[in-house]
């Protein structure tokens, strides 16, 4: 029996990806910080889709969380054939507003933990006849974003990492896909403490439903795509990052986020 392992799956895009994968008959492993939300999601998945769903409450900012995840899977004989690196968050405003510890925690969750999970699980994924790594990046990965500068940089890392390891794993059973959502109806803005009314209003106009984003992500993963950009507006935005001068893009983002 195989499982899909999804991080940051207690709510938002991660939770919807767990539901989408369960809908397609996958057994599910979900990881996040909030044990109550995880338990509720696991119960709902088992009841709704008649698949197994187990959860582990962990803070993925803890460098030891990856080893704990691997031990949990090994002790319970959970065979993982899908790894979804979804957990992540942002810090908004001037980059000087936050200290190094705050950035280290964010970079651990957004960058180091996904890479560490990949390093730990690739040897196991290679044992499966077909397996997948799905990394959730962001439309912010395509450019510098003043006001979300370090977050955007962390998502550029995820995108570049995904494409690089995809190529290196091209002759294996593992397919790697990066997904770049734009504004999505989740708690990202409140967690990032975005205060710019202009940015909040823009996001509200462009917000995609998390369920729709999750379906696009899973469709892209199973189709073996290298990269998925969710929604027409975000696709246009990605094209503009290639066409327009970087200075114009950065000025626009800075104006949007009030820095």
Which ranges hold each PLM region?
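Substrate-binding pocket helix/loop in short-chain dehydrogenase/reductase
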Residues: 94-95, 99-105, 115
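Residue(s) in the substrate-gating loop at a strand-loop-helix junction
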Residues: 138
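Active-site helix of classical SDR
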Residues: 118, 154
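C-terminal helical subdomain
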Residues: 178, 200-238
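The beta1-alpha1 cofactor-binding region of Rossmann-like NAD(H)/NADP(H)-dependent oxidoreductases
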Residues: 35-36, 56-68, 100
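Conserved glycine-rich cofactor-binding loop
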Residues: 10-12
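Conserved glycine-rich Rossmann-like NAD(P)H-binding loop of the short-chain dehydrogenase/reductase
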Residues: 24-41
């Amino acid at each position: 029996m195989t499982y899909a392992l999804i991080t940051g799956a207690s709510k938002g895009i991660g939770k919807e990806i767990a539901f989408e994968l369960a809908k397609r008959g996958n057994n599910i492993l979900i990881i996040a910080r909030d044990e109550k939300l995880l338990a509720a999601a696991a119960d709902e998945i088992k009841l709704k889709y008649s698949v197994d769903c187990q959860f582990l409450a962990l803070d993925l900012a803890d460098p030891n969380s990856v080893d704990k995840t691997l031990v949990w899977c090994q002790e319970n004989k959970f065979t993982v054939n899908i790894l979804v690196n979804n957990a992540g968050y942002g810090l908004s405003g001037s980059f000087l507003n936050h200290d190094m510890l705050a950035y280290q925690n964010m970079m651990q969750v957004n960058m180091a933990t996904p890479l560490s999970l990949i390093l730990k699980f690739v040897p196991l994924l290679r044992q499966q006849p077909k397996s997948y790594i799905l990394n959730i990046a962001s439309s912010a990965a395509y450019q510098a974003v003043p006001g979300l500068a370090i977050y955007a940089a962390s998502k550029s890392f995820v995108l570049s990492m995904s494409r690089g390891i995809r190529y290196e794993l091209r002759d294996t059973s593992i397919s790697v896909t990066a997904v770049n959502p734009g504004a999505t109806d989740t708690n990202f803005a409140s967690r990032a403490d975005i205060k710019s009314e202009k940015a909040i209003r823009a996001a509200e106009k462009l917000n995609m439903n998390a369920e729709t984003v999750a379906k696009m992500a899973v469709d892209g993963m199973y189709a073996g795509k290298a990269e998925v950009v969710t929604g027409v507006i975000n696709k246009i935005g990605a094209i503009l990052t290639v066409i327009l001068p970087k200075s114009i893009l950065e000025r626009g983002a800075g104006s949007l986020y009030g820095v």
